[in-house]
Amino acid sequence: MQDKFTQKTIEAIQLAQTEANRRSHLSIGAVHLFYALLTQENGLVPKLIDKAGASSDMIKVRIEKELDALPTASQMPDDGNLRYDGKFNQILIDAAAIAKTLYDEFISVEHILLAFIDDKKTSIGKSLKELGVTKDKVLNALKDIRGNQRVTTDSPENQYEALKKYGMDLVEHARTGKLDPIIGRDADIRSVIRILSRK
């Protein structure tokens, strides 16, 4: 399954592992993964949560409190590697199922967020519900960000909002009067050139 993760998903899993190690926790749990999604550099999950009408910062504070409450280990396992707990694995399995229903070829961070929203057993799912983050709102926010694009590469997050970032909406500029009035008036410009070029 790991070969079907996007780069940002792999990065989030690695960040979750790093956070669990840093805090000397007994295992890597779903809460570590969600914290990694919230703190990921240029992450998509905070944008989706904010567009869904909640505060990603408020959720982050709740998750940090939950991480602080987890028990710590006095020493690391013999092999030095922490184990992923069952909930962590279940979230990834659920995310894979969600990716399949959206006809995406790779498991991306938005699929993991949707898996957390669907999960009513964890405190994360309950917190998201309390703050009004629903599956429909996230799917609408996702449609705003990625349009009708499917996840067909391992780095789709780089393509999201590319048009907004590197292009401009000419129709919107025309409506607001920001567009030069000459644009789109080729016939008028040719007529003026013909008149001016006469002797």
Region spans (language model):
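Histone-fold recognition with a strong bias for associated Lys/Arg-rich disordered tails
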Residues: 1-199
